[in-house]
Amino acid sequence: MKYMITWNERSQGSAVEYEKAQQRILDVFRKWECPANFKIELFVIRVGDWGGYMLADCDDPVTVHKFCSTLPAFTFEARPVVPVMDAVRVELEAIAWRDGIKGK
C-alpha cells in the first residue's frame, strides 16, 4: 500500500529552544534507517517551510506508524493513496453498478 505522508514542525518555544529542536531533529534523522518493507518513492521539503511530503510504499501500517513516531518534533498525517487510474476504474465500476439498480 502506498501512503502520502505529510509533516509539519510542531511549534517550539523561544528561538534558542527552536534551534536546539532543529539540532535534535537532525541528530535523530541521521541515525534513522529505513526498514526493508518501507520503500520511499518521493521525499521532498516544501520550499521556505519546515515541512514536506513523502510517498512511501509499505505493507505494514504499524511500520508507517513507527516512522511517524520517530520524530516527535513533527506532526504527521499518513494517508493511504491509490493511483488515479485505479481510482477512476473502480469509480466507473461503481457508477455502472448503481446505474444497473432498477428503481421502484
Stretches with model-predicted labels:
Residues 1-34, 39-42, 46-50, 61-62, ...:
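Short S/T/G/P-rich N-terminal loop/turn motif that feeds into the first structured element of a domain
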Residues 37, 72-75:
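Glycine-centered loop/turn motif at secondary-structure junctions
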Residues 51-56:
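Short cationic amphipathic helices and targeting signals
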Residues 57-58, 70:
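Conserved catalytic core of Hanks-type protein kinase domains
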Residues 62-65, 79:
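A generic structural signal for well-ordered alpha-helical surface patches
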Residues 64-72:
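Short amphipathic alpha-helices in soluble, non-transmembrane regions
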Residues 74-86:
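Conserved short beta-strand edge segments in small beta-sheet-based binding/regulatory domains
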